[in-house]
C-alpha cells in the first residue's frame, strides 16, 4: 500500500510498461468507472506546440480577476508535482492528491495507466469534487489522443 505522494509517484513511474501508448480507451474506461462527473461549469483546453503553460496561467489569472473560481491542470511540473493541479492559483494539498490516486486505483481494476494518465485522472477527480466555475486543462504530448481530450471543452 502506498501511503505518501513520493511512494505513489515512484510506483507510477514503473507501473506502465510502455513509454508511448496513446489512446483514450484505458483512461476512458477508468473515468467511466469513476462516474465521469462534469468538472466545472466552463472547461477550457489549451493545446499547441509552445506556450501552453503560460497560456494556462494567463487564463487562470484572467478568470480569477473576474471573480471566477478556477482549477487548472498542467504538466510537466517545474519543482513540485503538486503544482500540476491548482485551485485559484494554490497547489493541491499532498493528502488530497494521495486520496485522488487512491480513488483512481480503486476504479482502474487491472487497467494499466501511463504516468500522465494517472496525473490527468487525479486532476479530473479533484476538480470534479471541488466544482470550480472554470477548469483550464493543458494538453500533454498526445494531441487529439491526449488524456485531457477525454473531457469535452467549451473552448480550446
Question: Where in the sequence are the language-model features?
Answer:
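ATP-dependent carboxylate-amine ligase catalytic core
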Residues: 7, 18-20, 24, 28-39, ...
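Charged, amphipathic alpha-helical linker segments immediately N-terminal to NTP-binding catalytic cores
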Residues: 1-19
Amino acid at each position: 500500500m502506498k501511503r505518501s505522494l513520493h511512494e505513489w509517484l515512484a510506483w507510477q513511474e514503473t507501473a506502465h510498461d510502455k513509454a508511448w501508448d496513446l489512446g483514450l480507451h484505458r483512461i476512458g474506461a477508468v473515468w467511466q468507472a469513476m462516474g465521469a462527473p462534469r468538472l466545472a461549469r466552463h472547461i477550457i483546453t489549451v493545446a499547441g506546440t509552445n506556450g501552453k503553460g503560460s497560456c494556462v496561467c494567463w487564463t487562470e489569472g484572467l478568470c480569477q480577476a473576474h471573480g471566477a473560481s478556477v482549477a487548472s491542470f498542467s504538466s510537466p511540473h517545474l519543482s513540485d508535482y503538486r503544482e500540476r493541479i491548482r485551485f485559484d492559483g494554490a497547489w493541491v494539498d499532498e493528502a488530497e492528491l494521495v486520496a485522488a490516486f487512491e480513488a483512481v486505483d480503486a476504479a482502474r481494476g487491472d487497467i494499466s495507466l501511463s504516468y500522465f494518465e494517472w496525473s490527468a485522472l487525479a486532476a479530473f477527480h479533484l476538480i470534479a469534487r471541488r466544482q470550480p466555475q472554470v477548469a483550464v486543462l493543458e494538453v500533454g504530448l498526445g494531441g487529439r489522443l491526449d488524456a485531457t481530450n477525454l473531457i469535452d471543452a467549451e473552448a480550446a
